[in-house]
Amino acid sequence: MNQEVKSGKVLSPSTPWTQRPVPGIEVADEQQTLKATFTEPTIECPECHALVTRTAISFNAYVCPQCDEHLRMKARDRLNWFFDNVVAELGQEFSAKDPLKFVDSKPYPDRMREAQTKTGETEALIAMQGNLNGVDMIACAFEFDFMAGSMGTVVGDRFVKAAELAIEKRQPLICFAASGGARMQEGMLSLMQMARTSAAIQKLKDTGLPYIVVLTHPVYGGVTASLAMLGDIHIAEPKAMIGFAGKRVIEQTVRETLEEPFQRAEYLLDHGVVDQIVHRHALRDTVSRLVSKLMNLP
């Protein structure tokens, strides 16, 4: 059989032309290249489209090492990254009910099960007690992938419990907000959480304890209209979208075209809505420093 040898490989006449070497050009072995590239899962940056391994992006706090884009961080990952040491998780005893027997394209309990399977979490808010740089504090984080981080009764229960524990322990409360708003499947019960969380925050403030909100991408609706805008200090991550109604809804209502950076963190900083924009890598130290100043700690 007529065969030719190229680069140590035996090629037969049936070898596709795409696999035949071009004279004068060195080509890496295809299998070695694939093995090197796909030894672990990768994440594509939505901004620069660079492929980054999950290990690398996790080590970098979910900030793209190529373009510095802040990728969305899961709530549990964020709290574990934020705290030096986690003491306890709060509010795990609360579970969602379906008092309205709500059905849209599918029953509410089915949506809940899908969200739990997708995220591995039982609800859209995780609350933990831990310490950062030697200071004990309470922190909450929204899981946006759980029904768009929508606020229902369990989210309200967990937030209120976190605020009450902060008061009891004389510790500051930190909230990482990321939500599409109130959960429509719970109707008025969901809207009531705006009042409940706001009242809990006021009790916290009455005791002189700080409440710091970190606005991550995105924050909208009833969460913006309540707990996300009641902080003593509001920090935003770069390029986070923050608002009540979305840009498209507003444009359709007022029949005007809004300027491009509308509702971006940078635009809101220029207009006095947020106090500062902080890179995620500097966030732990920034919160720690603010807490120390607000609580007159050494």
From Swiss-Prot:
Pathway membership, UniProt: Lipid metabolism; malonyl-CoA biosynthesis; malonyl-CoA from acetyl-CoA: step 1/1
Zn-finger segments (C4-type): 20-67
Coiled-coil region list: none
Subunit structure: Acetyl-CoA carboxylase is a heterohexamer composed of biotin carboxyl carrier protein (AccB), biotin carboxylase (AccC) and two subunits each of ACCase subunit alpha (AccA) and ACCase subunit beta (AccD).
Keywords: ATP-binding, Cytoplasm, Fatty acid biosynthesis, Fatty acid metabolism, Lipid biosynthesis, Lipid metabolism, Metal-binding, Nucleotide-binding, Transferase, Zinc, Zinc-finger
Protein family: Belongs to the AccD/PCCB family.
Gene Ontology molecular function terms on file: acetyl-CoA carboxylase activity; ATP binding; carboxyl- or carbamoyltransferase activity; zinc ion binding
Catalysed reaction equations from the record: N(6)-carboxybiotinyl-L-lysyl-[protein] + acetyl-CoA = N(6)-biotinyl-L-lysyl-[protein] + malonyl-CoA
GO annotations of cellular component type: acetate CoA-transferase complex
GO BP term, example: fatty acid biosynthetic process
Subcellular location: Cytoplasm
E.C. number(s) listed in UniProt: 2.1.3.15
Residues reported in the UniProt entry to bind Zn(2+): 45, 48, 64, 67
Region (Disordered): 1-21
Domain (CoA carboxyltransferase N-terminal): residue spans on this chain: 41-298
Organism: Acinetobacter baumannii (strain SDF)
Cofactor details (free text): Binds 1 zinc ion per subunit.
Purpose of the protein: Component of the acetyl coenzyme A carboxylase (ACC) complex. Biotin carboxylase (BC) catalyzes the carboxylation of biotin on its carrier protein (BCCP) and then the CO(2) group is transferred by the transcarboxylase to acetyl-CoA to form malonyl-CoA.
Protein name: Acetyl-coenzyme A carboxylase carboxyl transferase subunit beta
Cofactor: Zn(2+)
InterPro entries xref list: AcCoA_carboxyl_beta, Acetyl_CoA_COase_Trfase_b_su, ClpP/crotonase-like_dom_sf, COA_CT_N
Keyword NADP: no
